[in-house]
Regions:
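Contiguous segments within soluble domain cores/interaction surfaces
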Residues: 1-117
């Protein structure tokens, strides 16, 4: 399968857009959430490369079905992209009720960090 997002080793741009979408095509309402984290893990490794809310920005808390706008973005920093490889990535949302939900909730997004050509 091809990656959902490709970035070159050491690059911190472009920022990573994300949507929190349910399997049925509807979007989560992120109004009033208490935390949104970006998590990224190298395939085959149990340790997480990234697990942070720092750098996560909510731009559009409410999206309509069919929207191509992102709910938000993750801004890469530091050593986020220093190790080439195929990664799994997901968003962890904590709602005001304290309940937690992972997106995508039907698999993981694929991020590839490549070597510069």
């Amino acid at each position: 399968m091809s990656p959902d997002f490709v970035i070159t080793k050491g690059d911190l741009l472009p920022i990573l857009p994300f949507q929190c979408q349910y399997r049925d095509g509807t979007f989560a309402d992120l109004t009033g959430v208490t935390s949104v984290k970006f998590v990224m893990q190298l395939k085959g490794v149990t340790a997480e490369k990234i697990n942070t809310s720092v750098g996560v920005t909510i731009l559009n808390p409410v999206l309509q079905v069919g929207s191509i706008l992102p709910h938000g973005t993750y801004s890469w920093s530091g050593t986020d992209t220093d190790t080439p490889g195929d990664y799994q990535a997901w968003i962890v949302v904590t709602f005001a009720s304290g309940k937690i939900l992972h997106f995508p909730n039907y698999g993981r997004s694929r991020v590839q960090v490549t070597l510069a050509e």
